[in-house]
Amino acid sequence: MAIRKYKPTTPGRRGSSVSDFAEITRSTPEKSLVRPLHGRGGRNAHGRITTRHKGGGHKRAYRLIDFRRNDKDGVPAKVAHIEYDPNRTARIALLHYADGEKRYIIAPKGLAQGAPVESGAGADIKPGNNLPLRNIPTGTTIHAVELRPGGGAKMARSAGSSIQLLGKEGTYATLRMPSGEIRRVDVRCRASIGEVGNAEQSNINWGKAGRMRWKGKRPTVRGVVMNPVDHPHGGGEGKTSGGRHPVSPWGKPEGRTRKNKASDKLIVRRRRTGKNKR
């Protein structure tokens, strides 16, 4: 993938850029693997906003992605097409299996049209192949990793992301996450080889607010420019600082803490935050 920059023909075009989509080999998705996707606009079943800054955007169809791949062990497949998916930053690859079935997977870097792909404990260590962690050599770069055996890929699925397999001891494998966090995962969990493609996605300059609206993202408004009825920081004559420690629109202190999860005990080292990111 490469980035194509626009000429500054308008203020919105100045500095903006777009993917050149050079790796895309097909413009329409496989009909049997597409489902309708209805926008919720950030509302729940009662019609109340539960997630702010969502709504609008271009109409999309959801592509069914195979995140498990455990029922196709030993069945060879070929990459028929590399396609665009509006629901994620990564590209997707359409696989044609030898038994006649078609499925989508996340397209890793280096996977091209016509490439062979397989899954199972005996699969080769090549981009796109899917194996249990116990069968992957230490030091291998992987993506689409499961948190629980059979639960489907949960980690490292976005464009350019990858996880490094640091080691294996007993029933656990040690992984270095994209955030820098080091955690342990059951060796029966499956992962795909290689890093996710479309790594230049993060370098795209969107250029104008309208392109964000096409993606279904609404404006984020600061509390200090609202009225007192809308936010605890609102109101005041002229420009103010809010007059209190930062809080949410509902008065809760900014920077909330999170409850402990059962899987937290498997974290060896926390992710880098604040000054530690350097």
Curated annotation (Swiss-Prot):
One GO MF term: transferase activity
> Per the record, where are the segments of Basic residues compositional bias?
37-58, 268-278
* Keywords, alphabetical: Ribonucleoprotein, Ribosomal protein, RNA-binding, rRNA-binding
Q: Name one GO cellular component term.
A: large ribosomal subunit
The reply on keyword Cell membrane is no
Stored SUPFAM superfamilies: Nucleic acid-binding proteins (SSF50249), Translation proteins SH3-like domain (SSF50104)
Q: Which GO terms describe its biological process?
A: cytoplasmic translation
Chain spans, region Disordered: 1-58, 225-278
**Is the keyword rRNA-binding in the record?**
yes
In this chain, composition skew of type Basic and acidic residues spans 253-267
Give the record's subunit note.
Part of the 50S ribosomal subunit. Forms a bridge to the 30S subunit in the 70S ribosome.
- What NCBIfam families does UniProt report for this protein, alphabetically? rplB_bact
Function statement: One of the primary rRNA binding proteins. Required for association of the 30S and 50S subunits to form the 70S ribosome, for tRNA binding and peptide bond formation. It has been suggested to have peptidyltransferase activity; this is somewhat controversial. Makes several contacts with the 16S rRNA in the 70S ribosome.
Q: According to its UniProt record, which protein family does this protein belong to?
A: Belongs to the universal ribosomal protein uL2 family.
Q: What is this protein called?
A: Large ribosomal subunit protein uL2
Organism expressing this protein natively: Rhodococcus jostii (strain RHA1)
